[in-house]
Design a protein with these regions (language model features):
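Short loop/edge segments at beta-strand edges and connector loops
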Residues: 36-38
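Charged catalytic cores and adjacent phosphate/nucleic-acid-binding surfaces used
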Residues: 2-33, 44-170
């Protein structure tokens, strides 16, 4: 995400450069395929933090909230639902924003989120990082009953972080 400067988020030029590199590797390694994906911030108004012409170049887009956690339940729910109506969003990441023992989940109407996710074919992530474990397992049955596809993500910021996926499937 280009607004996530603290996490080394890519500006538009970096995204374009990365795409050229992925395309070159795909040509070289065929039939092996590297998918081009990114985590994009969901801004306060529900838009994603890259323009549509950039988003259109990805195979998948995980969109998450990384700021402005203090909105009301209605505002936060509307924000997330607007984002899921983007034709480019593939997965809702960090669906409640919680960090275990550090930050409570932001207020959000998950049943409405599940309904909009199912209608727009947006998967909802189980973030398997042991500091998050978000989406809480106790609401997974409601998500599935609403017809939502579940995605398991390791929230890996390095190679060792890939091992976190075990906490999402274990």
């Amino acid at each position: 995400s280009q607004t996530a400067v603290y996490a080394g988020g890519l500006k538009i030029e970096g995204v374009k450069k990365q795409r050229v590199e992925i395309d070159a590797l795909n040509k070289k390694l065929s039939p092996f395929v590297i998918f081009a994906g990114i985590e994009s911030d969901i801004l306060a108004d529900g838009s994603l933090d890259y323009p549509d012409d950039i988003l259109a170049g990805f195979d998948f887009i995980i969109a998450s909230i990384h700021s402005r956690f203090n909105l009301s339940e209605k505002e936060m729910t509307d924000r997330v639902c607007r984002a899921m109506e983007s034709r480019y969003m593939t997965i809702l990441g960090d669906p409640t924003g919680r960090l275990l023992l550090a930050r409570e989940a932001y207020p959000i109407d998950l049943d409405r989120v599940f309904e909009v996710a199912a209608a727009n074919r947006v998967a909802i992530e189980i973030n398997a990082d042991p500091h998050r474990l978000d989406l809480d397992w106790r609401v997974l049955a409601r998500a599935r009953a609403a017809g939502v596809t579940i995605s398991i993500g390791a929230d890996a910021h390095n190679l060792a972080g890939l091992a976190n996926v075990e906490f999402g499937i274990g």
